């Protein structure tokens, strides 16, 4: 669900934000009447200094980054390697470092971990990981244990390497076929990809599926997120961009990046990189 605002100010005229109905509130944990968000677990969060888009030399390595509010980084368990131990969902929380929500698990042995929250999971639900786990929302197991047609997310590219694929809000992949040693998945991009059957994945779709419908409403909200303005190359000086300078607006040649490379149509994929795991390309 998402929330639209009355146009009380210019910034709220176009503003569309998530309703955050799935999140657990402090009142649910304490019994008090309050709508405040649950604070992150202290042992599973730490302050991470913003890079501002700079590398170790201080040079801009990623443009349009800088500023923004301070964030606490939440340590997420992408490996889900605590096999055979049941865990109960304590809370579903907001994470400023990613588009999806996160869920705090309390394992039967007392350990707590954060995971990516699947869509529909709520406080009090029980999950488990490992071989023989039930086909239940939030449970984690190897791809070979999943029936055809299963919807999965947080998928490993190599066994025991931790989930790398399908982690953004609202995404899900589908188990399409099985061959000896490998499982074929249909990715959110439309690509069909083969993965080792020993790779782990989590049942369900990633939470916050309305994330793509949100509208920031004003430039200032982008700045709060640490996003700086994008300046056109033709508006720059020749020293700053290949399109810069000149008396008119025409740059006189094909579009190029700030570093002089052709920017439209030039293939950038390494020719030596293997395509044997891609059954069907997302572009075809």
Curated annotation (Swiss-Prot):
The keyword rRNA-binding applies. GO terms for cellular component: large ribosomal subunit. Residues 264-284 have a biased composition (Basic residues). Keywords: Ribonucleoprotein, Ribosomal protein, RNA-binding, rRNA-binding. Residues 240-250 have a biased composition (Basic and acidic residues). It comes from the Bacteria. Residues 232-284 are annotated as: Disordered. GO terms for molecular function: rRNA binding; structural constituent of ribosome; transferase activity. Pfam families: Ribosomal_L2 (PF00181), Ribosomal_L2_C (PF03947). GO terms for biological process: cytoplasmic translation. The keyword Transmembrane does not apply. SUPFAM superfamilies: Nucleic acid-binding proteins, Translation proteins SH3-like domain. Belongs to the universal ribosomal protein uL2 family. Part of the 50S ribosomal subunit. Forms a bridge to the 30S subunit in the 70S ribosome. One of the primary rRNA binding proteins. Required for association of the 30S and 50S subunits to form the 70S ribosome, for tRNA binding and peptide bond formation. It has been suggested to have peptidyltransferase activity; this is somewhat controversial. Makes several contacts with the 16S rRNA in the 70S ribosome. This is Large ribosomal subunit protein uL2. The lineage of its organism: Bacteria, Pseudomonadati, Chlamydiota, Chlamydiia, Chlamydiales. The gene is rplB.
